[in-house]
Amino acid sequence: HYRQCGLRVRVFKCGPDFLDPMILERASGAPVYQLDLWMGGEAESRRVLWEAAGEAELIVIEGEMGLFDGAPSAADLARHFGVPVLGVIDAGAMAQTFGALAFGLAHFQADLPFAGVLANRTGSLRHGDILRDSLPADLRWFGALPRSSAVELPRRHLGLIQAQELADLDARLDAAADAIAASASTDLPLPVS
């Protein structure tokens, strides 16, 4: 979405992964690198973030597993560098519970810079409205991504299909960006200095 808005975007991936970065690279139009406090260390992580900040207007760091899973976790990385967290929650089978889950993510660790949430796999515009309205007043809504075959990436036994195997990947990414643009109701978090 933000690339379509004309922003230069750099993306990093927490932990070891080779499938997600290929898809993220297509979405961002820039190389995607691993960012991990354990594997690369604090100094290397700081260096690559500093370099990316010099060439991009937005840096996105995709976590691995759940926000608090692993040691160090994506939450540890966010806290260490003061990076605002956007919680992406699979909302396909919930309504008001979405607000409770978002509240739990935001308040589980008091010092986590939590920016807000985005709902994934929503059933309709009305479903997105219900999810947004379930949020406590202090949590920001970043939009909803609908459940749609035009957006979802196919999977197989061991995970996602590789980027080069998807002839329509760019169309899927464009559809996802359009869906987020249609439901987003807030600006980006404040820049990290």
Residue ranges and their predicted role:
Residues 1-81, 89-112, 125-129:
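ATP-dependent carboxylate-amine ligase catalytic core
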Residues 85-88, 142-144:
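Short hydrophobic alpha-helical runs that function as membrane-insertion/retention elements
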Residues 95-193:
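Internal gly/pro-rich beta-alpha loop/helix module
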